UniProtKB/Swiss-Prot annotation:
Modification note: Methylated by PrmC. Methylation increases the termination efficiency of RF1.
Keywords, ordered alphabetically: Cytoplasm, Methylation, Protein biosynthesis
UniProt-annotated stretches for the region Disordered: 284-313
Function comment: Peptide chain release factor 1 directs the termination of translation in response to the peptide chain termination codons UAG and UAA.
GO cellular component labels: cytosol
Record PROSITE patterns: RF_PROK_I (PS00745)
The organism's taxonomic lineage, starting at the top: Bacteria, Pseudomonadati, Pseudomonadota, Gammaproteobacteria, Enterobacterales
Family of this protein: Belongs to the prokaryotic/mitochondrial release factor family.
GO molecular function: ribosome binding; translation release factor activity, codon specific
Pfam families according to UniProt: PCRF (PF03462), RF-1 (PF00472)
Name of the molecule in the record: Peptide chain release factor RF1
Species: Escherichia coli (strain K12)
Modification type N5-methylglutamine: residues: 235
Leader peptide range in chain numbering: none
Gene Ontology BP annotations: translational termination
């Protein structure tokens, strides 16, 4: 391992020990905000520190085994130990490289999830409903909270469009690679001939930004319309114009919110989604510039980004970005998404490592 990387790891290990000491200090415990910030930092440094300690121990084992090679009686055992220690050292170095990769500051944030029915009419709306249920199950398993912000139901079930806020630890980091096109191949319930139809939905995942980081939106750039909400919401839901539609004139982005009975609450929710969408559009522009030189696994939420195909007759799901095919569609639709999410995160990390080695 390069001396510069070892020096960086030593500094992080020292900081980990320093933070551990601070967390036991009475003054720190009394200051709740500082205590929380240090607890987060401690958790972030723990894996690096533990892995680096293991690596240091293995270097000592290698040194000891090399010294034993000079002893004829110990040579054979020393050679075995040396081979094992070198293999372990390589594994730990790879782990440390991944742990040192630059973190996306948005990864720990809550996220807005949008699922939109694309081509395929009623069947696309039904599939949008299935996708939303799949993500809700995944969120439930991870103890995340799902709050529907806006929903437009399909005529025969499912959703033409649904927007939800998902809150919890590391939501955006886990879900961000879901953005893009999702295609389904199956026999619709309305199909009497048993023919397989292909429909599509688009998914967009955007980080929820704190107020201080939301893009500056000029009120003059907004057109705000009110209308009577439709759908679920109790007996009083249709009696007032509580639903809100906000159009951002410079970008043409439109956000509707009709989930709350209060117009004020709907407006606040719609503005937070609008801010996230504008931020996501700006991010997509930057990513397009980067993608011209390097492939980008992070979809734009556009239909042309084909992420996955869900083939029901064959029980197959394929992720086209990394050529991964699994015959476990039933489990995936029940929210067991880690088998698809983990490989793409690993592929993304491999791309980051390749980019770093090119820079060096």
């Amino acid at each position: 391992m390069k001396p510069s990387i070892v020096a960086k790891l030593e500094a992080l290990h020292e900081r980990h020990e320093e933070v551990q000491a601070l967390l036991g200090d009475a003054q720190t415990i009394a200051d709740q905000e500082r205590f929380r910030a240090l607890s987060r930092e401690y958790a972030q440094l723990s894996d690096v520190s533990r892995c680096f300690t293991d690596w240091q121990q293995v270097q000592e084992d290698i040194e000891t085994a090399q010294m034993m090679l000079d002893d004829p009686e110990m040579r054979e055992m020393a050679q075995d130990e040396l081979r094992e220690a070198k293999e372990k050292s390589e594994q730990l170095e790879q782990q440390l490289q991944v742990l040192l990769l630059p973190k996306d500051p948005d990864d720990e944030r809550n996220a807005f999830l949008e699922v939109r029915a694309g081509t395929g009419g009623d069947e696309a709306a039904l599939f949008a409903g299935d996708l939303f249920r799949m993500y809700s199950r995944y969120a439930e398993a991870r103890r995340w909270r799902v709050e529907i912000m806006s929903a437009s139901e399909g005529e025969h079930g499912g959703y033409k469009e649904i927007i939800a806020k998902i809150s919890g630890d590391g939501v955006y980091g886990r879900l961000k690679f879901e953005s893009g096109g999702h295609r389904v191949q199956r026999v619709p319930a309305t199909e009497s001939q048993g023919r397989i139809h292909t429909s599509a939905c688009t998914v967009a995942v955007m980080p929820e930004l704190p107020d201080a980081e939301l893009p500056d939106i000029n009120p003059a750039d907004l057109r705000i319309d009110t209308f009577r909400s439709s759908g679920a919401g109790g007996q009083h839901v249709n009696t007032t114009d509580s639903a809100i539609r906000i159009t951002h004139l410079p970008t043409g982005i439109v956000v509707e919110c009709q989930d709350e009975r209060s117009q004020h609450k709907n407006k606040a929710k719609a503005l937070s989604v609008l801010g996230a969408r504008i931020h996501a559009a700006e991010m997509a522009k930057r990513q397009q510039a980067e993608a011209s030189t390097r492939r980008n696994l992070l979809g734009s939420g556009d239909r042309s980004d084909r992420n996955r195909t869900y083939n029901f007759p064959q029980g197959r799901v394929t992720d086209h970005r990394i050529n991964l095919t699994l015959y476990r569609l039933d489990e995936v639709m029940e929210g067991k998404l880690d088998m698809l999410i983990e490989p793409i995160i690993q592929e993304h990390q491999a791309d980051q490592l390749a980019a770093l080695s090119e820079q060096e």
